[in-house]
């Protein structure tokens, strides 16, 4: 292979790598909360695994309405405000689901969160993890808001 072909392959390889990196968002921030329950994972998942069941266990949610296809939930917040969220992935075998925020008053963009339940001795460990960028607020303020949402649930 001559030098010109090697240069062309190198340039193409770098271009492909840059394109791949550009297609995956780099989240600036993350929040998480871990809770424990004496109940078995299946019991816990029955309570928190219903995508629109959040109104039954999160004190900030007044009402949840689910779209006909079950993929979008509209959350009416106590005190006013609405958040629309999309179910991105559900894995019942792994006791988890992931969702994104479509729109709402939270100071975040590119938000993706996963709630999962795992066996923990005779009980369960509940993990709520979110990755996002701050929008219209500082990183610290966005993290404070999302951390508060997670701790409240």
What are the residue ranges of the model-derived segments?
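A conserved amphipathic terminal alpha-helix motif
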Residues: 125-127, 131-153
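Residue-level marker for the onset of beta-strands and adjacent loop->beta junctions
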Residues: 31-33, 60-62, 71, 83, ...
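Hydrophobic-ligand binding "helix-grip"
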Residues: 66-67, 76-123, 131-133
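Bacterial N-terminal signal peptides
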Residues: 13-23
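Hydrophobic pocket/interface hotspot
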Residues: 44-48, 54, 73, 87, ...
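Bacterial N-terminal signal peptides that target proteins for export
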Residues: 2-14
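Extracytoplasmic/secreted envelope proteins and their assembly/folding machinery
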Residues: 41, 45-51, 58, 84, ...
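Hydrophobic ligand-binding cavity/cleft-lining segments
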Residues: 24-66
């Amino acid at each position: 292979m001559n030098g010109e072909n090697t240069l062309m392959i190198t340039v193409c390889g770098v271009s492909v790598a840059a394109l791949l990196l550009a297609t995956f968002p780099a989240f600036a921030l993350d929040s998480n909360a871990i809770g424990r329950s004496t109940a078995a994972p299946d019991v816990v998942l029955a309570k928190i695994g219903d995508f629109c069941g959040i109104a039954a266990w999160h004190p900030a949610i007044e009402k949840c309405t689910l779209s006909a296809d079950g993929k979008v939930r509209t959350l009416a917040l106590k005190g006013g405000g609405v958040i629309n969220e999309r179910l991105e992935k559900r894995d019942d075998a792994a006791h988890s689901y992931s969702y994104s925020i479509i729109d709402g008053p939270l100071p975040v963009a590119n938000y993706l969160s996963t709630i999962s339940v795992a066996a923990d001795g005779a009980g369960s460990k509940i993990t709520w993890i979110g990755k996002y960028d701050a929008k219209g607020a500082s990183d610290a303020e966005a993290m404070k808001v999302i951390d508060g949402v997670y701790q409240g649930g």
